[in-house]
Each structure stands twice: as C-alpha cells, then as structure tokens.
Amino acid sequence: MRDREVPITMSTWLRPTSILSNALRTVAAWVGLAVLTVAFPLIADTQAAASSGQSRHINAQRLQGNLEKLSEFGRNPEGGVTRLGYSQTEMDARTYVMGLMKEAGLEVRVDAVGNIFGRRAGTARLPTLLFGSHIDSVPHGGNFDGTVGSLGAIEVIHALNDAHVTTRHPLEVVIWTNEEGPHFGISALGSGVAAAVLGPEILDRKDEEGLTLADWLRRYGQDPSHLTDARIPRGALAAVVELHIEQGPQLYETKVQIGVVQGIVGLKRWKCVATGVANHAGTTPMNRRKDALAAAAKDLLAVRDVVRSEPGRQVGTVGYMKVDPGAPNVIPGRVEFPVELRDLDSATIERMWEHIQQRFAQTDKEEGVETRCAVINDTAPAISDPSVQSVIREASHSAGLSTADLPSGAVHDAGEISRLTPMGMIFVPSRDGISHAPQEFSTWDDVANGTEVLYRSILSLDKQMNAR
C-alpha cells in the first residue's frame, strides 16, 4: 500500500542576485522587523525567493494593513481572536469587510444564510470565478485562519483595478459564514447551504444560549424560510479557488513557499459507548471488574496503533471521554467517546475502521464490556481539479516561488463547493504548524506570496476556462 503515501514534490527556482541587491535586502529585512505590530507574533522571514516582492502585482502593504485592522475585531488580551460565527463581534467584522469590498468597487450582497458576495462584472456572459474564505474563528483562535484568503481575495480585486485589467468571466469574492462551527456544531455551514449539502433541517439547531440558527438569521436581517435561496445553481460557477494558511508544519519545515492542495481529506466520525458495570471501587476485586474506562483507554490506543500502522498521512483521533458516573470511588460503568478518521482516500478510512472494530471486539472480551459505535458524520474527500492544480502550480513558478503538492487535513469551504464546480486551493506556510491558537502565524511575505499566486491563478483561469 506504499502507493497511498502522498509525496511532497519540490521545485525551487533560484534567481541571480547582485551583491548590492543582497545588501539592500539585508537592510530592508532589519527595517521590516521593526514595523510589525504587537497584534502578531514576531518572526524573521526565512523564505528567500520572493523577499524583494519586485514582481508582485498585489499591494502587500495595503493587504497587511487591512489584516491588522480586521484582527482588532474580537482581539483577546493574550493575542489572537475570538470571533465566532453569528456573534456580534463577527457581525461588526463583517461590516468592516463589506466596506473593504465596496472600496474595491465590488457590488455587495448577502445571501439567505449570511454568506457575503462581492461581484466584479466580466466582459462576457460566462460562469463566475469564485474565490475567498471566511472571517469567523474558533474560541481563542489565530489572526490568519480564513482571513488571509478573505482579504487576499479583496486585494486581488484592488490589484486588477490598479492595473486596469478586465476579465471575461465575472469575478466574485465570497466570505463564507460560520466555517468553524463551534457556535452551532456545524462546520462549513454557509458553504454547505450554498452547495445544498445542508438545508432547512439545521434551522432549529441551538447554540449555548439557547438561540436557534433561525434566531441568528433574523438578527442578520435574513428570513429563515428562504434559507434554500442561498443555494448556488449548478453551472453558475466556472471554478472556485481558496487561499488559506496550511495549518500544518509541512511547508514551514521544508521551507517551501506555496502548497498546491491535492484535495481535502474525507472525514468519518463515530460516537462510541463502552458499557461495563459500575461498582464500589474499594470492595470489587480487580479480577471481577467490568471497567468501561479501562476498555475505552485500550480502545483509544487501538485507534492510534491502527492509524500509525498504515502507510500514508492518514490521522485518527479520540477527542474526549465522558465517564459515568465519574466519581473517584466508583468503577466507571459507561464511557462515551468519539473516533474520528481522516484521509484523502475513503477506502483507507474504511479499512482502518474495520481493523479498529476488530481491536475493540478483542478489548470487550478481555474487559467484560460491550462497545457500540454509530456513525455521526461522514464527509467524502474533495479532490482538487487537476487543471486548477496546474494553474496554481504554474502561477507560483511564474512568480519565482517554490511549490509542494500536499493534501489538506482540515475541512475548508472550497471542499463543499467542489460538489458544484472545479476546485483548487493555495496554501502558505504556518509557523511550526500551529493553528486555532493565538500563536498562529504566517509571515507577511508568505501572505503576500499566496495572494500574488491567487491573482495570477485567477487571470490564468479566466483565459483557460474560456478555451474549454
């Protein structure tokens, strides 16, 4: 099964540089370190190929300023942000971003679920090229997740306007709503509704305050009864592209500047319950116990062992355990825990689960318990369109940037929209692979590199899609 490994392929283009230009870059690097704001962690830029930014069409300073301003909405004292979907903080941030869209000359609208679209007309009657991301965050999240792709998309429009470039396809910048999901427990909510994956059944979902999604939509000024109006018709889109931070360590550790995403991994999640017998912890001999927690602990290690035994980059997680009755002097009689498996290949997920079930059955026999599992989430992999991958790769190389092909282990809105149209994603490095935390960071040079690749990719797609 070695062929299931996802190789990291690298191509680095070196430019001849003079002694003078190297000296100027050294001085500029020291000066640049002084102007980083306290809103973002400090890091010296180790990426070499694009440090001068001489060939960029986008305005890196404008982009940085807009991102720094956005980071003020929901800023936490310890750094990072808390900007949950459908919260007042996110509403305020949305108002700011819609203002940026209008400044870029976009025609702005909000759909029935709260997704924001900014449209730039094309010169021909063609399907729309869609690109953007999200601005909501997890609790105590970082400043770059989603925001780089959202404001990077707006910067692409600015750059096109600055250069007086027209496109044949209409262009739409999209800010998807509630991508992270902690508010209602539904990830990629806005894009899921747009792709007809989610429907009116989600309107009664409640948050921790007891408010339903329908309640929040009314606060947005939307009519919940029109939720399905947010669905994007098939044939309306030419392609979707999302710029995002990697949220993993591969690009940062290998010093590769751009990730060309092969696809977004599939995710399957089970709710498991191990049932034993609750009994007195002091009077029940060890050889007479039916300890549900002991069994669940073995099950957790079984998940880890099975996933590690597979060649490739698959992952498996047991994220929590709920122990009942949860007292220090009572043998646990019931334990609830989830099992989550992710891989770019659905067959690999199913094979791992079969082996995990065999291990669970063995543990049940050893510990005298019964473990039952039920599927609660099953999301198929979203494979990037090969032609869009090629466009992104060529756009990177034309800008003198190194590339690597890699999968996305995280869920993204582009994956939902891939059900409707060809999809591609652009990754930029995340320092130490940290994300969903205040320490999340990508250098400004990497952010600008990714936005430049997005700019070039959109122009290439505009030309190539016409020829099909």
Residue ranges and their predicted role:
Residues 178-179, 183-347:
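Midchain, well-structured core segments that form catalytic/ion-binding scaffolds
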Residues 131, 140-180, 268-274, 280-306, ...:
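Alpha-helical metal-binding/catalytic segments enriched in His/Glu/Asp
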Residues 45-81, 121, 330:
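N-terminal hydrophobic or amphipathic helices/low-complexity stretches enriched
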Residues 23, 27-41:
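Bacterial N-terminal signal peptides
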Residues 55, 63, 73-76, 129-133, ...:
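Zn-dependent metallopeptidase/amidohydrolase metal-coordination segment
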Residues 75-121:
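A non-catalytic alpha/beta surface segment that caps or lines the substrate-entry region
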Residues 85, 319-326, 338-344, 370-389, ...:
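A short beta-alpha structural unit
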Residues 262-264, 280, 284-310, 348, ...:
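His/Asp/Glu-rich mid-to-C-terminal helical/loop segments that flank catalytic regions of hydrolases
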